[in-house]
């Protein structure tokens, strides 16, 4: 009992955050990136605090959708098709600094073993049986829809659509294995009621609860497909005539990536690799201590279109297998483009890699995190992305550039004021209460910032967090602009420069989870040493050694102005 208590204390700070695994049947898009960014910031922040954190992403490579896409693209084997496409998702993650600990593919051998194990446990515990399935199936969604959610296609006579995704459905009758989902209604509802943060935000939790409590008993779920129809999938254990349903397969990745079901059940330490194909590389290996605790502290970050699979099916599979439930499922909206759904036919699909190459990956990271709410769909507007970059240049970049001018001496200011007790500066501006008040307020905001970051990141409220960052940057710029340090005697000048540079230093340290590359450039520009970029130095006056060469002429600015991409393209076309 004492041992269990020690384990709980040791790993109460462990976290495992996941994105959905993505279909590699087309190029990665903004929605893929957004899920990854939400997860990446959370993961980076946990590491920044010194906590143990794991982060899983990857590709969902089985199923009829992949099989059909492979055939239509002229591949004789689906594996060759996904082998060609999955690197594009790895590339997206690399460009945007997505710091995952495991990129899992559902074709990885260790994952296939875990799918088999999950099936065997559910079967052994009496939750899987063979039956006949009749219903409306969507290839695009890889799921069946009830009659109540099927309508005639108004544009194509003889075809039918489902009312949820608006994708085509076809009527099928076949023999499948079924999962006894009907036994889990009350268990799932009870768990959500006892753990109100299990589904977040609250609006999505309430929606799921309403569906579970008013929709009647859940129908049992078909969890296999005939091998004659679905050739590309994991065979069901001991029955090659059936393939495992793609969602039963895909959801299991969250267990495979933290050591697998046997390790979770025994809570035994396991070694996993960042990429299974590179498992012999010791540098890419990661130790997963106490996998059961890691599973209990898992947060799934998902899009609203797959909420049912994660909030109803997945907990039911885990309960049936005797495995711990995750801590939380965070559901976010989708991304539009200029108020319209993105589609190839409209020609408005945003390529996140193109955006990163022109504007910079960290600019796109900031823009997406600032202009989104979990409860709503985001609206991508390239003009607004450009405006975000301009603001970072003119406000944060310019704050650094002005204070690094030859008229000032950052090193002297830091040495003079970093030791001031409680940072009470009123005596320096005795006859200027407005300046004194601005300095005091800025100092308080900076010392409070670490707590604000912790609070907002814990609940994925990134827009609120970035508003806090902007308010501090604006206050620092106002202080410099209105107090005119270039016209003052040295003590007053150094006091103002110290506060302005502490603003940039502290925010750059804290924003490493949000803009990992740009924050390093800002810190490099004011000569903050690499070892002093940790959470221990994100307090006023905690670094007394930076700024030594910052006021030398000829230093490169960390962020420069660029023209609007579409405007530059038009100019190039005319020339």
Swiss-Prot record:
It holds the Pfam family tRNA-synt_1g. ATP binds at residue 344. One of its GO terms (cellular component) is mitochondrial matrix. It catalyses: tRNA(Met) + L-methionine + ATP = L-methionyl-tRNA(Met) + AMP + diphosphate. Coiled coil: none annotated. A motif ('KMSKS' region) lies at residues 341-345. Its main location: mitochondrion. Keywords: Aminoacyl-tRNA synthetase, ATP-binding, Ligase, Mitochondrion, Nucleotide-binding, Protein biosynthesis. Signal peptide: none annotated. A motif ('HIGH' region) lies at residues 20-32. The keyword Protein biosynthesis applies. Its EC number is 6.1.1.10. It comes from the Eukaryota. Catalyzes the attachment of methionine to tRNA(Met) in the mitochondrion. This is Methionine--tRNA ligase, mitochondrial. It comes from Saccharomyces cerevisiae (strain ATCC 204508 / S288c).
């Amino acid at each position: 009992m004492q041992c269990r208590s020690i384990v709980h204390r040791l790993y109460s700070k462990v976290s495992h955050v996941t994105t959905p695994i993505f279909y590699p049947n087309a190029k990665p898009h903004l929605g893929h990136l957004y899920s990854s960014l939400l997860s990446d910031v959370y993961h980076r922040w946990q590491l920044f605090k010194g906590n143990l954190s794991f982060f899983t992403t990857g590709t969902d490579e089985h199923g009829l959708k992949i099989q059909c896409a492979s055939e239509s693209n002229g591949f004789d084997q689906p594996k060759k098709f996904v082998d060609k496409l999955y690197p594009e998702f790895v590339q997206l993650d690399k460009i945007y600094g997505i710091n995952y600990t495991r990129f899992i593919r559902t074709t990885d051998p260790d994952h296939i073993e875990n799918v088999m194990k999950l099936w065997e446990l559910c079967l052994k515990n009496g939750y899987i049986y063979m039956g006949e399935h009749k219903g409306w199936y969507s290839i695009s969604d890889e799921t069946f829809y009830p009659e109540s959610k099927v309508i005639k296609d108004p544009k194509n006579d003889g075809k039918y659509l489902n009312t949820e995704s608006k994708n085509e459905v076809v009527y099928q009758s076949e023999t499948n294995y079924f999962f006894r989902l009907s036994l889990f209604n009350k268990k799932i509802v009870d768990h959500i009621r006892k753990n109100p943060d299990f589904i977040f935000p609250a609006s999505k939790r309430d929606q799921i609860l309403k569906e579970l409590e008013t929709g009647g008993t859940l129908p049992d779920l078909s969890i296999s497909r005939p091998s004659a129809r679905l050739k590309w999938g994991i065979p069901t254990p001991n029955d090659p005539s059936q393939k495992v349903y793609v969602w039963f397969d895909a959801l299991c990745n969250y267990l495979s990536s933290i050591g697998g079901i046997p390790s979770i059940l025994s809570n035994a330490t396991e070694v996993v690799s960042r990429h299974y194909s590179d498992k012999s590389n010791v540098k890419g290996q990661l130790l997963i201590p106490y996998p059961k605790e890691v599973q209990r502290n898992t947060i799934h970050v998902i899009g609203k279109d797959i909420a049912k699979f994660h909030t109803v099916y997945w907990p039911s599979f885990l309960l049936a297998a005797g495995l711990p439930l995750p801590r939380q499922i965070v559901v976010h909206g989708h991304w539009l483009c200029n108020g319209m759904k993105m589609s190839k036919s409209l020609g408005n699909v945003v390529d996140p890699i193109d955006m990163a190459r022109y504007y910079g990956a960290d600019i796109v990271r900031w823009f997406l995190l600032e202009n989104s709410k979990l409860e709503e769909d985001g609206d991508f507007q390239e003009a607004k992305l450009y405006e975000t970059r301009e603001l970072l240049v003119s406000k944060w970049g310019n704050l650094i550039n002005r204070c690094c001018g030859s008229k000032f001496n950052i090193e002297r200011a830091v040495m003079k004021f970093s030791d001031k007790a409680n940072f009470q500066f009123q005596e320096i501006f005795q006859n200027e209460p407005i300046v004194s008040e601005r300095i005091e307020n800025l100092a308080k905001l900076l010392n409070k910032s670490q707590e604000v970051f912790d609070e907002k990141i814990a609940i994925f409220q990134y827009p609120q967090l970035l508003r806090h960052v902007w308010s501090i940057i604006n206050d620092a710029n106002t202080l410099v602009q209105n107090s005119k340090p270039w016209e003052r005697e040295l003590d007053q000048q150094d006091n103002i420069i110290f506060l302005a540079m502490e603003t940039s230093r502290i925010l750059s340290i804290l924003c490493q989870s949000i803009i990992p590359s740009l924050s390093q450039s800002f810190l490099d520009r004011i000569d903050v040493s690499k070892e002093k970029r940790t959470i221990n130095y994100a307090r006023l006056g905690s670094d007394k050694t930076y700024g030594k060469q910052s006021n030398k002429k000829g230093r490169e600015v960390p962020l420069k102005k660029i023209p609007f991409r579409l405007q530059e393209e038009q100019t190039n076309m005319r020339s």
